[in-house]
């Protein structure tokens, strides 16, 4: 299948069908391809531009090959009725902004507000510090078996799902990704392949061209509610420096709109005010936010946490969700959730 796919994508610049994409990725994850073929596939897709069908087909193959995380108190009860939302804040990364790990801080705040969070993430591929790097620097043991991750989610209310542990077949892709050192379709697939089958998400993307595309992919993959976001300054989060483009998945359709910080009583700040560093620097920034320090960094986390609370159904609007997120920080609940996470994962 990989040879046919390469001819179609690289030679003829034709799109794959959803089924062809699924079969191609299954071959990749089955170890049936070479590093050169994987590299050609990734570059060819990047040059052609990935379609929604291709993205969905790839995601379906990765989901099928993943180690499932069985959560007893999951998003659905035995009758199939929605009970507790299960949220992920995993984004695409790859925005080259140099900011601290906003989506990881957001996950802790939202967990502090009482939402169950299955934070999917990995080590850095193209940035200084990936979500796995900063979570580890915060004291969390990320190398847990799936059963312990599920238990952590049930008992603590938040778990970090370390992608290499859940997607072991991705070992076939990593050499090509490391050598390419560029954004590829796998940046898009991380947020679409949560092993706990998260029912709601906030997904930051590195270009505005992907906002609606990723929202349509999430819709096809069965997400109940999601917000896909991209800041005007290039941030793959809701930004504090100006407008943010949003595509919201809700009630079986996608709605696009734009938001700005001042709509929610927050002041704009330059992107430089969100600058981070390595894992230790970013961990210190997150601790300061959870300690209640006022800054643009706190404000950008409030914005993103508000979006996550809306996605999880805990608030109808972001305006109503901002005070909920602020209380989770100022009451110490978010900090307490991190403490419990560190304690549980190091037992």
Curated annotation (Swiss-Prot):
Q: What class of enzyme is it?
A: transferase
Q: Does the keyword Nucleus apply?
A: no
Q: Can you state which reaction this protein catalyses?
A: N-(5-phospho-beta-D-ribosyl)anthranilate + diphosphate = 5-phospho-alpha-D-ribose 1-diphosphate + anthranilate
Q: Which UniProt keywords apply?
A: Amino-acid biosynthesis, Aromatic amino acid biosynthesis, Glycosyltransferase, Magnesium, Metal-binding, Transferase, Tryptophan biosynthesis
Check the record and name the SUPFAM superfamilies matching this protein: Nucleoside phosphorylase/phosphoribosyltransferase catalytic domain, Nucleoside phosphorylase/phosphoribosyltransferase N-terminal domain
**Coiled coil, from the record:** none
**Binding-site residues, anthranilate 2:** 177
Its GO CC terms are: cytosol
* Ligand binding (anthranilate 1): 91, 122
- Cofactor binding note from Swiss-Prot or TrEMBL: Binds 2 magnesium ions per monomer.
Pathways involved:
Amino-acid biosynthesis; L-tryptophan biosynthesis; L-tryptophan from chorismate: step 2/5
Positions annotated to bind 5-phospho-alpha-D-ribose 1-diphosphate: 91, 94-95, 99, 101-104, 119-127, 131
Q: Which PANTHER family match?
A: ANTHRANILATE PHOSPHORIBOSYLTRANSFERASE
Family from the record: Belongs to the anthranilate phosphoribosyltransferase family.
Protein name as it appears in the record: Anthranilate phosphoribosyltransferase
């Amino acid at each position: 299948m990989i040879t046919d796919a390469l001819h179609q994508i690289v030679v003829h610049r034709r799109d794959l069908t959803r089924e062809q994409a699924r079969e191609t990725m299954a071959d990749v994850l089955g170890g049936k391809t070479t590093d050169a073929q994987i590299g050609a596939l990734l570059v060819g897709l990047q040059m052609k531009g990935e379609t929604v069908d291709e993205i969905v087909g790839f995601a379906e193959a990765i989901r099928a090959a993943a180690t499932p995380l069985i959560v007893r108190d999951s998003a659905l009860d035995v009758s199939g009725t929605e009970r507790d939302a299960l949220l992920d804040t995993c984004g695409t990364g790859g925005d080259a902004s140099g900011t601290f790990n906003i989506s990881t801080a957001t996950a802790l705040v939202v967990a502090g507000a009482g939402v169950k969070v299955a934070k999917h993430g990995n080590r850095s591929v193209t940035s200084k510090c990936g979500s796995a790097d900063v979570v580890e620097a915060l004291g969390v043991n990320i190398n847990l078996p799936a059963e312990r991750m599920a238990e952590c989610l049930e008992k603590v209310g938040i778990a970090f799902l370390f992608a290499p542990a859940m997607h072991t077949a991705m070992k076939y892709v990593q050499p090509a990704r490391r050598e390419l050192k560029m954004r590829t379709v796998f940046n898009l697939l991380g947020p679409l392949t949560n092993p706990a089958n998260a029912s709601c998400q906030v997904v930051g993307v590195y270009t505005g061209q992907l906002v609606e595309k990723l929202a349509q992919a999430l819709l096809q993959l069965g997400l109940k509610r999601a917000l896909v976001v991209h800041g005007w300054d290039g941030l793959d989060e809701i930004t504090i420096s100006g407008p943010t483009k949003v595509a919201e998945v809700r009630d079986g359709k996608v709605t696009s709109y734009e938001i700005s910080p001042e709509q929610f009583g927050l002041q704009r700040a330059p992107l430089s005010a969100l600058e981070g560093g390595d894992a230790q620097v970013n961990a210190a920034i997150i601790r300061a936010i959870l300690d209640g320090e006022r800054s643009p960094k706190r404000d950008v986390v409030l914005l993103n946490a508000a979006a996550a609370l809306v996605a999880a159904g805990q608030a109808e609007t972001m305006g109503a969700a901002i005070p909920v997120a602020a209380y989770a920080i100022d009451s110490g609940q978010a900090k307490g959730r991190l403490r419990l996470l560190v304690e549980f994962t190091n037992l």
